[in-house]
Amino acid sequence: MTDILVLDLETTVERIAGRIDNSPYNPHNKIVSAHFGWLGWDDVDDYQYAVYHHIEQSQSDSTKSLREALRTAKILVCHNAKFDVSWLLEAGFDVPEKIYCTLIGEYLLAKAQRKELSLKGSAERRGLRNQKKSDLIDHWFQDGVDFFEMPLATMLEYAEADVRTTAELYLAQMDDFDAQENKSLITARDQMNEMLVFLVELERNGCAIDLAALDTVEKEFRAEKVELTARLTEIVEQVMGDTPINLNSGDDMTKVVYSREVIDKAIHKQTWNIGTNDAGKSLMPPRMSSNQFSDAVRATTRVVEKTQAVCCSHCNGFGSIQKFKVKTKIKLGKKYRIQTEEPYKNRTKCKNCGGLGAIYQPTGETAGLRMIPTGPSYAAAGGFKTDKETIQTLIGVATRKRKPVAVEFLTKLSRLSAVSVYLDSFVAGLKRGTRKNGILHANFNQCIAATGRLSSSNPNAQNWPKRGFPVRRAIVSRFDDGLLLEADYSGLEFRTCVELSRDAQGLADILEGKDIHRQTASICLQKDPKDVTKDERQGHKWASFQPLFGGTGAGMEPHIKAYFGKFYEIYRGIEAWHNSLMTGTLKNGIVQTPSGRQYFWPNVVRTRGNRVSHSTQILNYPVQGFSADMVQLACIRALRFFRQASLRSKLILTVHDSIVVDTHPNEVEQVKSILVEAMTRIDEEMVTRFGYKCVVPFDVEISAGKNWLDQEELSLTNAT
């Protein structure tokens, strides 16, 4: 028997607005049972369980055995350990200093390949002797019965299988990490398990939400949505005539934006390779010359004309017809059907106008904005793409071609889409997730993004716009006169790319303090760098990032495209590193970061035009992954320093490259100093952790305010 404890908890499950909520921060949820045992040579020894809250058991089992096991254990092993550790801490248990999550192990060993990482999926994929017994409980959950109410014997059998499967999975992972080709992953694994403890701290602390401020933001967004919809409707009437258009329909937006409609959807999908393959991946667009593309567009779609509505004579504009019941009578042995004056309850849809109440007659004038798709990648099931990225590209095209109506429509359509997301996801998410005590406990995910970056849900703060986003005003301090303090890495992805490539000019620019994002915005906006605003700098970061990942500026305005070419001339070391990455990946399919994280592309090939398949991922993943590991190391250090200082201030969020702290008014300077120390001096700890010495310095910007929106920059003088 070892000092490694394998554990699985079963809990009750509440529902909030129809959504499953098994959070330990829901006051109505409880631990139903704990199942645990000591790791043996090939299984669990001394398996035990304790039932604390079940309908069949009137008296709760003692917590003594679990407390003693947790006190004795050196390592706690769970699958999705963040869930179990959070529950244990909220229930008043102490946990071992070292946590091992088998979900993290499977995630890292997958090396960015899509694999089922659940306990059941992992056990089945590996062919483990022990298997998760989901079939025992699935039908109970489908019927709305959770662990509290389902038969106790069923739950106990299911949970024991979970513990034994987790133990066997752990042992299999230890063998995998021992293999020479996987040894580098051990460093990344250990850091991710430490980061798990930091995320538990964040989630437990939660964010204070000002619901009154959130209501105000919601009203502002709803008013803006009404205004945008009204103006877009006016433009639609201007360019489409009387044709009815749904702004949320991809088919209708193809008509408005591209002035075309699909003739036959089946033929359209076949022509443009729209759909997924057997592996669930999107099919690649067909290769076509420009002439072939133009011919295919004409073959699969037709030009849309403006229409004029004429009242339907069959239904008089109602769109439906009132029919009357018919009775059968017999006279002289013959049956007669006689219409009565009794109407049917529901009116019948008019076949002549399709229920529209009008006939839409073409006027002969081309409708829509007449934007032109430029290649097969524009094709979509409903015609041609009108997604966020495509709309932004089309706005640039319309601007260059001086189409003011198209620019206005596309800009407002993009904004309407954003506002709808803000309302449906962010505002509604905050309202739904905020507990009665005014605290929101977000959920952070380590094993979703292939790169190693964190994602979050309830809410997805990683997708919030960084500056000027009104929803941020609702996130406030829980302390009287407290501040929300945010420390953000300055230009982290550029610095990471320079670090990995060891580009000499990039290093010189960083050491001189050149603001790369400001330089980029000045070129894109064709204005002096000193005249670039903060929002403009933020809004043009994409142009700084794209060359880092092999972007060429194709399809963009000439002066922006020229910037991309100039970038590679200036930073030749980055271009050389890109070439070496792709050459190396063609040889062995692997890219590895200094932190030990690996990415694997088993099917990488050189394509026509001397390009490399998966090139964007090959160039993107190591920058994102190493950046993620640096941020995570900073988070681990911040938690360590907070605990050493016994601060009242709370670590509450990490978003992108920043750490956010709910700061007690008496601890502002102390928190500022700790964050600077934790974030700017990660290079010292990277030497001991990764055996890697950085040449690039990492700087932070710190701001503070009463809420997360209204922030003022703080001076870093004497911050360390």
Regions inferred by a protein language model and the residue ranges of each:
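Conserved catalytic palm subdomain of right-hand nucleotidyl-transferase polymerases, strongest
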Residues: V6-L7, C78-H79, Y100-L103, R478-L492, ...
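Active-site-proximal helix-loop-helix substrate-binding element of RNase H-like nuclease domains
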Residues: N29, G40-D178, T276, R518-L525, ...
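Function-dense linear segments that define catalytic or interfacial modules
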Residues: N443-P529
